[in-house]
């Protein structure tokens, strides 16, 4: 409906151009928003106030001219001017009911497919030298929810898991792997089952033994030179590490597969060419033996230019180099229209610099949108990044296991007579969903405090609340098995029916915002509000005990569409629904 109002306003502007009220070459940005106060209608625009200077008239006068130029439309019952020149649109109840019926009878809930784009999404991207920890949670689940929404909206999505599978630390790890296998193959396999412990043990050997450190450095050189033996060891290690990652992805219900992995090593053969191309365009400078790029747009507090280091003095490459190669690949080979990077906000300057440089070097053209979808940190009660009690890094798999345990205790307390198999099944969904939703419901640009107590609450904007809301709605139909809805129609008569219908009609707008801005919290907030609107409707409007059969069927249809929307919305967040809690 929002896009329909925008279309009506565009037609009105065409009339005003013909009447020479505004110049024919003027391109106005039409913005239509939902009103918060329904006494001011359903939608409002400040378009008239934006045209004041160009039309040389006061806003209310322009607003009236716009209203007079609007085409007749059966979906709009009334248009009014408010305040200094806002234009308020009231949607006809029967038009809203028809929109809801269309959504109910459509697998896509009435959401039209936009012009499809190719969208490359870089997310999760753990360092394979170590096991995944809580710091990887946000990129993984925020990126995955946006990917799901993009695909639902009809876009072609190419997932890119840009894992850290290259670097000097791999010499140390391969040396330790080699050492353990010489002692005992079983010991090596056992230690590799816990990568965090394996990494720490390798680091101790590297720091304490000069002979081990020398061997590790030689292995790095051999690996980078394409040595067959070293490459075999390296591939084995990465395969084991990726297996750990995909166990976590499976538990999280994340859609990443092995086919989506394109790590740093995939660009090794392109890095020297990146340096040559930057050099040939006169963009490279030398600083302390390193090859760098200075850009006038980026300076430190003292006003000195900040470098983008492309190649170290020892010939090694950095993140900027591989990121430039990846951007060129995504633009020219994958033919991306958008490239989204779900990476910590603390990398904002890095991405600003490499995005700007990639355009200057013509690695990408202006047709591709490069977007850093930065996010804040997940913190403990002390407001600092989440750690174990001893100050160590929390492994993601341990966090999920604790969520399962706590969820099982919660579900058992609510259902003391339920059998253990059913309890475990429900607890698994509740535990993982609670961790994911607690994160996704926060503005991604903000830090947040991680709290099991809050995320497992049945009150407020939490996964348990929404999962229970869904089971409550779905449960109505277990008591209405004899009702034939084949010829039923939605009728919006009671105020709470209209409020629920209005909220249901906003699903498309919310998803559009989510995919354009990479903001899952917009969808979370919407689903929470929808559950609240249904609760208010259910209390005020008896469903199975409605006054008439026609009214009962209409309210059952509203309940059915609510259930479909909640299920679809939670599914886009990567959250499985339950029929019973």
Curated annotation (Swiss-Prot):
'HIGH' region, short sequence motif: residues: 126-136
Classification via CDD domains: Anticodon_Ia_Arg (cd07956), ArgRS_core (cd00671)
Uppermost EC category: ligase
A Pfam family per the record: tRNA-synt_1d
Catalytic activity: tRNA(Arg) + L-arginine + ATP = L-arginyl-tRNA(Arg) + AMP + diphosphate
Gene Ontology cellular component terms for the protein in this record: cytoplasm
Main location: cytoplasm
BP term (GO), one: arginyl-tRNA aminoacylation
EC number: 6.1.1.19
Location relative to the cell: Cytoplasm
Keyword terms: Aminoacyl-tRNA synthetase, ATP-binding, Cytoplasm, Ligase, Nucleotide-binding, Protein biosynthesis
Molecular-function annotations in GO: arginine-tRNA ligase activity; ATP binding
Keyword hit for Coiled coil: no
NCBIfam families linked: argS
Family listed: Belongs to the class-I aminoacyl-tRNA synthetase family.
Binding partners and assembly: Monomer.
HAMAP family to which the protein is assigned, alphabetical: Arg_tRNA_synth
Protein name according to UniProt: Arginine--tRNA ligase
Organism: Shewanella woodyi (strain ATCC 51908 / MS32)
Lineage, opening ranks: Bacteria, Pseudomonadati, Pseudomonadota, Gammaproteobacteria, Alteromonadales
């Amino acid at each position: 409906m929002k896009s329909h109002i925008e279309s009506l306003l565009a037609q009105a502007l065409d009339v005003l151009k013909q009447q020479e009220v505004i110049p024919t070459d003027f391109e106005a940005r039409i913005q239509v928003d939902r009103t918060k106060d329904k006494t001011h209608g359903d939608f409002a625009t400040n378009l008239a106030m934006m045209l004041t200077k160009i039309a040389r008239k006061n806003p209310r006068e322009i607003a009236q001219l716009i209203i007079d130029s609007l085409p007749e439309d059966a979906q709009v019952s009334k248009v009014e001017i408010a305040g200094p020149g806002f234009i308020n649109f009231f949607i006809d109840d029967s038009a809203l009911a028809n929109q809801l019926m269309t959504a109910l009878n459509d697998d896509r809930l009435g959401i039209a497919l936009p012009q499809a784009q190719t969208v490359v999404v870089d997310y999760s991207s753990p360092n394979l030298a170590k096991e995944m920890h809580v710091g990887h949670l946000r990129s993984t689940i925020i990126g995955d929810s946006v990917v799901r929404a993009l695909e639902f909206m009809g876009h072609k999505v190419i997932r890119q898991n840009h894992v850290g599978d290259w670097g000097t630390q791999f010499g140390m790890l391969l040396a330790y792997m080699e050492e353990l296998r010489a002692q005992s193959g079983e010991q090596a396999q056992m230690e590799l089952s816990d990568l965090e412990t394996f990494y720490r043990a390798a680091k101790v050997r590297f720091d304490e033994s000069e002979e081990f450190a020398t061997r590790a450095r030689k292995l790095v050189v051999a690996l980078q030179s394409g040595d067959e033996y070293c490459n075999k060891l390296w591939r084995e290690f990465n395969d084991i590490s990726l297996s750990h990652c995909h166990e976590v992805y499976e538990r999280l219900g994340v859609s990443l597969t092995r086919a989506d992995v394109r790590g740093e090593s995939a660009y090794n053969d392109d890095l020297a060419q990146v340096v040559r191309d930057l050099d040939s365009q006169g963009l490279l400078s030398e600083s302390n033996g390193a090859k760098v790029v200075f850009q006038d747009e980026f300076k430190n507090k003292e006003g000195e230019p900040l470098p983008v280091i492309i190649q170290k003095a020892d010939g090694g490459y950095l993140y900027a180099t591989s990121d430039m190669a990846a951007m060129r690949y995504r633009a020219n080979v994958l033919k991306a229209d958008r490239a989204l990077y779900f990476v910590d906000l603390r990398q904002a300057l890095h991405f600003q610099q490499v995005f700007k440089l990639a355009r200057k070097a013509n690695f990408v053209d202006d047709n591709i949108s490069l977007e850093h979808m930065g996010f804040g940190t997940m913190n403990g009660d002390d407001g600092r990044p989440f750690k174990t009690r001893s100050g160590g890094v929390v492994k993601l798999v341990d966090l999920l296991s604790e969520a399962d345990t706590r969820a099982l205790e919660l579900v058992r307390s609510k259902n003391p007579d339920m059998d253990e198999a059913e309890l475990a099944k429900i607890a698994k969904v509740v535990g993982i969903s609670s961790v994911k939703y607690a994160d996704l419901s926060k503005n991604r640009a903000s830090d947040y405090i991680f709290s099991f107590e809050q995320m497992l609450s049945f009150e407020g904007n939490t996964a348990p609340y929404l999962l229970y809301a869904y089971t409550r709605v779905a449960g109505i139909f277990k008591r209405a098995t004899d009702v034939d809805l084949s010829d039923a129609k939605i009728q919006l008569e009671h105020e709470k029916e209209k409020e629920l219908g209005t909220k249901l009609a906003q699903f498309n707008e919310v998803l559009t915002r989510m995919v354009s801005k990479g903001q899952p919290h917009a969808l979370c907030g919407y689903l929470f509000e929808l559950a609240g609107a249904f609760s208010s409707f259910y209390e005020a409007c008896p469903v199975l005990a409605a006054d008439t059969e026609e009214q009962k069927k209409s309210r059952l249809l509203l309940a059915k569409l609510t259930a479909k929307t909640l299920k679809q919305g939670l599914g886009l967040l990567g959250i499985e629904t339950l029929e019973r809690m």
